[in-house]
């Protein structure tokens, strides 16, 4: 089992699919990585040599923000919006939808479970 960017990559899967187990690498990024390193699509992780795994690791470290760094960057961006007290920051603070969705009905995922109101029975 290869370990890249702090993540154990599954050995029996194709390299293109296995790289997507790393947070911050999707299908497009994985394809770019294997093209840069020169690995064909059909290869599986258990068929990679140590040198190829090292090349993949170096490419990811050099060109991509992944895992903990990406999560930290995202949370810092949200914290910055909240500190600025701009509209988006206030919506994040209140736990409401940020991108203009309606809240009179719906938005239950963001707002949490419905709170019962006294005297509202039929």
Swiss-Prot record:
What processes does the entry annotate via GO biological process terms? translation
Region: Disordered, residue numbers? 95-122
Give disulfide pairs as residue numbers.
Answer: none
Q: Which UniProt keywords apply?
A: Ribonucleoprotein, Ribosomal protein, RNA-binding, rRNA-binding, tRNA-binding
Which Pfam family is an annotated match for this chain, by its short name? Ribosomal_S13
Which superkingdom is the protein from? Bacteria
The GO terms this record gives for MF are: rRNA binding; structural constituent of ribosome; tRNA binding
Checking Gene3D superfamilies in the record gives: 1.10.8.50, 30s ribosomal protein s13, domain 2
| Record InterPro entries | Rbsml_uS13_C (IPR027437), Ribosomal_uS13 (IPR001892), Ribosomal_uS13-like_H2TH (IPR010979), Ribosomal_uS13_bac-type (IPR019980), Ribosomal_uS13_CS (IPR018269)
User: GO CC annotations?
Assistant: cytosol; small ribosomal subunit
Family affiliation: Belongs to the universal ribosomal protein uS13 family.
Q: How does it assemble?
A: Part of the 30S ribosomal subunit. Forms a loose heterodimer with protein S19. Forms two bridges to the 50S subunit in the 70S ribosome.
Q: What does this protein do?
A: Located at the top of the head of the 30S subunit, it contacts several helices of the 16S rRNA. In the 70S ribosome it contacts the 23S rRNA (bridge B1a) and protein L5 of the 50S subunit (bridge B1b), connecting the 2 subunits; these bridges are implicated in subunit movement. Contacts the tRNAs in the A and P-sites.
NCBIfam families under this entry?
uS13_bact
Q: What is this protein called?
A: Small ribosomal subunit protein uS13
Output the lineage of the source organism.
Bacteria, Pseudomonadati, Pseudomonadota, Alphaproteobacteria, Caulobacterales
GN (gene name): rpsM
């Amino acid at each position: 089992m290869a370990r890249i960017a702090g993540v154990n990559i599954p050995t029996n899967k194709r390299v293109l699919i296995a790289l997507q187990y790393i947070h911050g690498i999707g299908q497009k990024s994985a394809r770019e990585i294997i093209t840069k390193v020169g690995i064909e699509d059909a290869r599986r992780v258990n068929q990679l040599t140590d040198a190829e795994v090292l090349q993949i690791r170096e490419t990811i470290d050099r060109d991509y923000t992944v895992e903990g760094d990406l999560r930290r960057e995202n949370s810092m961006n949200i914290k910055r919006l909240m500190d600025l007290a701009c509209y988006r920051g206030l919506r994040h603070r209140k736990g409401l939808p940020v991108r203009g969705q309606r809240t009179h009905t719906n938005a239950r995922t963001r707002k949490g479970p419905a709170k019962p109101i006294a005297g509202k029975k039929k």
